[in-house]
Design a protein with these regions (language model features):
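A short, N-terminal "cap"/entry segment at the start of jelly-roll beta-barrel domains
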Residues: 1-36
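Short loop/turn motifs at secondary-structure junctions and domain boundaries
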Residues: 17, 45-46
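A cytosolic small-molecule/anion-sensing beta-strand core signal
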Residues: 30, 57-58, 77-78, 96
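Short, conserved beta-strand element in jelly-roll/cupin
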Residues: 38-39, 47-66, 103
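Short, surface-exposed secondary-structure edge patches
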Residues: 44, 53, 72-74
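Short acidic-glycine-tyrosine-enriched beta hairpin
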Residues: 67-86
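Ligand-binding loop in jelly-roll beta-barrel domains
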Residues: 86-109
Length: 109
């Protein structure tokens, strides 16, 4: 982290959490949070009460999601972005270590 008076620069590749899904808070803009997550373990199935943007900054992630009650999955590579609308059930399974930028409503699971 390089910090000035009005800017912060985060070097995502140098962030390592003490546990899976550890997060570094980057910003909270009117109740919308931006957090950098580090993980090497799957999350849990969940449904957000708001929209979610999930950007893979480093590594690969298999994202499972349900559309019309049917489970599907896709591999997200570094640079890929997953968008989940309100009410979309999903779960992320990193394939090794991954660093992920998540933008969502404050307090989301």
């Amino acid at each position: 982290l390089i910090e000035g008076h009005t800017v912060k620069i985060f070097r995502s590749k140098s962030f390592t959490g003490e546990r899976a899904w550890a997060a570094l808070d980057i910003a909270n803009m009117n109740g919308i949070t931006t957090r950098l997550h580090w993980t090497d373990q799957p999350y849990k199935w969940h449904v957000n009460d708001g929209q979610e943007v999930f950007a893979v900054l480093d590594g690969r992630v298999e994202m499972h999601f349900k559309e019309d009650g049917v489970e599907q999955s896709t591999i997200l590579e570094t640079g890929d972005v997953f968008y989940a609308s309100v009410g979309t059930a999903h779960v992320a399974h990193p394939l090794g270590v991954a660093r992920i930028l998540v933008v969502e409503s404050e307090g989301s699971v």
